[in-house]
Curated annotation (Swiss-Prot):
<dbReference type="GO" id="GO:0009423">
    <property type="term" value="P:chorismate biosynthetic process"/>
</dbReference>
<dbReference type="InterPro" id="IPR018508">
    <property type="entry name" value="3-dehydroquinate_DH_AS"/>
</dbReference>
<keyword id="KW-0057">Aromatic amino acid biosynthesis</keyword>
<keyword id="KW-0704">Schiff base</keyword>
<feature type="active site" description="Proton donor/acceptor">
    <location>
        <position position="143"/>
    </location>
</feature>
<feature type="binding site">
    <location>
        <position position="213"/>
    </location>
    <ligand>
        <name>3-dehydroquinate</name>
    </ligand>
</feature>
<dbReference type="GO" id="GO:0008652">
    <property type="term" value="P:amino acid biosynthetic process"/>
</dbReference>
<protein>
    <recommendedName>
        <fullName>3-dehydroquinate dehydratase</fullName>
        <ecNumber>4.2.1.10</ecNumber>
    </recommendedName>
</protein>
<feature type="binding site">
    <location>
        <position position="236"/>
    </location>
    <ligand>
        <name>3-dehydroquinate</name>
    </ligand>
</feature>
<feature type="binding site">
    <location>
        <position position="21"/>
    </location>
    <ligand>
        <name>3-dehydroquinate</name>
    </ligand>
</feature>
<dbReference type="Pfam" id="PF01487">
    <property type="entry name" value="DHquinase_I"/>
</dbReference>
<dbReference type="GO" id="GO:0003855">
    <property type="term" value="F:3-dehydroquinate dehydratase activity"/>
</dbReference>
<dbReference type="GO" id="GO:0009073">
    <property type="term" value="P:aromatic amino acid family biosynthetic process"/>
</dbReference>
<keyword id="KW-0028">Amino-acid biosynthesis</keyword>
<comment type="function">
    <text>Involved in the third step of the chorismate pathway, which leads to the biosynthesis of aromatic amino acids. Catalyzes the cis-dehydration of 3-dehydroquinate (DHQ) and introduces the first double bond of the aromatic ring to yield 3-dehydroshikimate.</text>
</comment>
<dbReference type="InterPro" id="IPR001381">
    <property type="entry name" value="DHquinase_I"/>
</dbReference>
<comment type="subunit">
    <text>Homodimer.</text>
</comment>
């Protein structure tokens, strides 16, 4: 299986990498939170742009991205607009969503973009090609904050992302039972052993799914999300606790 290298970080080998999400409403908060995050122990900084109020002003968005880049130049920067339908803060048109991601790619400030699988097949394929032409990696994602489908459907979605040339397929699902967590873990293992030729990221959310955020190295998930301050999704634990557990499992 091939790995994905972003800056000096190799994703897909060793212990799962820790991603943290920065969610700030304006440039002043972006700056203050970036300074606070700089001291934390994590591997990838995700900027959740859907929390940014001045979204219609591309110059303002990119000015904020520049602050993040300059504050943490060594950290890979993942640019993510999470749509309202997949648990995000704002709803925008597909056209605006694609344009925003293209602007991020053009800026030269971001290392990766998050691209939602169900944006539309043609738009997804075109945006992946555009990102790769500009040396930007793509985390292709799907989130369901209500339920967990059968393992076969989870695998089908991850394989579709891979077929669309995502650098890293990602899926996050809400369990209604412990059995749903097992379905997610079983799907992750089957995908990793039988179909994946690149790193994948999977997680089961909420308290019920916390084990999936810790056991990625066992079942085949290459990264996990932790919290520096406020969690960006239910079930996230602090980066310090997360690093401790990931290290214990890696060294066992």
């Amino acid at each position: 299986m091939k790995t994905v290298t972003v800056k000096d970080l190799v994703i897909g080998t060793g212990a799962p990498k820790i991603i943290v999400s920065l969610m700030a409403k304006d440039i002043a908060r972006v700056k203050s939170e970036a300074l606070a995050y700089r001291e934390a122990d994590f591997d990838i900084l995700e900027w959740r742009v859907d929390h940014f109020a001045d979204l219609s002003n591309v110059e303002s968005v990119m000015a904020a991205a520049k602050i993040l880049r300059e504050t943490m130049p060594e950290k890979p920067l993942l640019f993510t607009f999470r749509s309202a339908k997949e648990g995000g803060e704002q709803a925008i048109s597909t056209e605006a969503y694609i344009a925003l991601n293209r602007a991020a790619i053009d800026s030269g400030l971001v290392d990766m973009i998050d691209l939602e699988l169900f944006t539309g097949d043609d738009q997804v394929k075109e945006t992946v090609a555009y990102a790769h032409a500009h040396d930007v990696k793509v985390v292709m994602s799907n989130h369901d904050f209500h339920k967990t489908p059968e393992a076969e459907e989870i695998i089908a979605r991850l394989r579709k992302m891979q077929s669309f040339d995502a650098d890293i397929p990602k899926i996050a699902l809400m369990p209604q039972s412990t059995s749903d967590v097992l379905a997610l873990l079983a799907a992750t293992l089957e995908m990793q052993e039988q179909y994946a030729d690149r790193p994948i990221i999977t997680m089961s959310m909420a308290k019920t799914g916390v084990i999936s955020r810790l056991a990625g190295e066992v079942f085949g998930s290459a990264a996990t999300f932790g919290a520096v301050k406020k969690a960006s999704a239910p079930g996230q634990i602090s980066v310090n606790d997360l690093r401790t557990v990931l290290t214990i499992l890696h060294q066992a």
